[in-house]
Each structure stands twice: as C-alpha cells, then as structure tokens.
Amino acid sequence: MKPGCTLFFLLCSALTVTTEAHAQTPDTATTAPYLLAGAPTFDLSISQFREDFNSQNPSLPLNEFRAIDSSPDKANLTRAASKINENLYASTALERGTLKIKSIQMTWLPIQGPEQKAAKAKAQEYMAAVIRTLTPLMTKTQSQKKLQSLLTAGKNKRYYTETEGALRYVVADNGEKGLTFAVEPIKLALSESLEGLNK
C-alpha cells in the first residue's frame, strides 16, 4: 500500500477512537459519537450526498465512494472512501443496510514544496463545500468563514468538536501528518419547558 494511503487510513481511524470534545484532552480515550449504538444518521445516502455535492460544486468533483473492509465495527457500519487527488480524500461511515451517512470526512495530507499553498486551498474548498451540501441555506462565503473558524479553533488539537443546530463539526489536526474535517448529525431533544407546553 502507498504511504499516502496508509496515512489516510490512520487519520480516518483517528476519528474512530478519540478523546472527549471541545479541545479538552482528558487522559481517557472514548468512542467517537457516530460509533455509539443509536447514533443518528443524515436522511441522506452516500450516493444522494455525492449527487448533491457534485451538482452544487461542478468545479469540485467527488468521485464514487468505494467500500473499505478494514473496520472492526463491521456489524454496525460500512466505511467507504473516495480519492480526490494525491493528498485529499473523502471518507464516510454509513449505517449498515441503509447506507445513510453517520459521518462524512475530508482528510488532507500536507505536501511540501511550492504546491502546498494551492493544495491546502483546494482542500479547504472541498471542506467548505461539505458544509454547504449539508446546510443548503449557507452561502459560499458563510461556509468558508465557518470552516476557517473551526480550523482556527481546532488548530494543533488532535480532536476538537463544535455543535451547531443538528450538526457536529469535528477537526482532527495532526500537524504535518494531516488534517481531518468531519460533519456528523446529532440528536436534538426538546427542552423540558417546551415538552411541557405540548401536554
């Protein structure tokens, strides 16, 4: 296997077993939220996501996802990946059977040399496009600002998460080894005061 592919799979695994959220680094590792029993899915299959992504972003093609048979949690999830270029990959964790998305991830493997700035900019274009695809009311400028805010907050942190509405944004910044950005659905619960009004 090529070194870049090996690193990509290691970075994908970084989101599988991680430390707890919000830039804190406790001593104990916990399971990534999307791996927990009953974790929600987007009401979107990976093929629907890809179709929406490509129609909204014609200059950012997303190739077909291929199943990855390397996960210990095969009973609950199907993992798939799509190579965008030599240093950028999309990956996903899908609900087994329905193929609905539990987590959609973009992993950038930094390159050295004169192409680094352009490669990083292209990776960030893809990451912002993922935000827009899952948040259709967000403009291109808003998604870019949101991404920059998340990347700044997650800079040099092995695991950073932030929630907004029904979405969880995850940044796993491993410096020169790579950066993974993910978007995952979360369960929303009515507050007790709102539930009381419904009785």
From Swiss-Prot:
InterPro entries associated with the record: DUF1454
Range of residues in the leader sequence: 1-23
Keyword line: Signal
Matches recorded under Pfam families: DUF1454
Protein name: Uncharacterized protein YiiQ
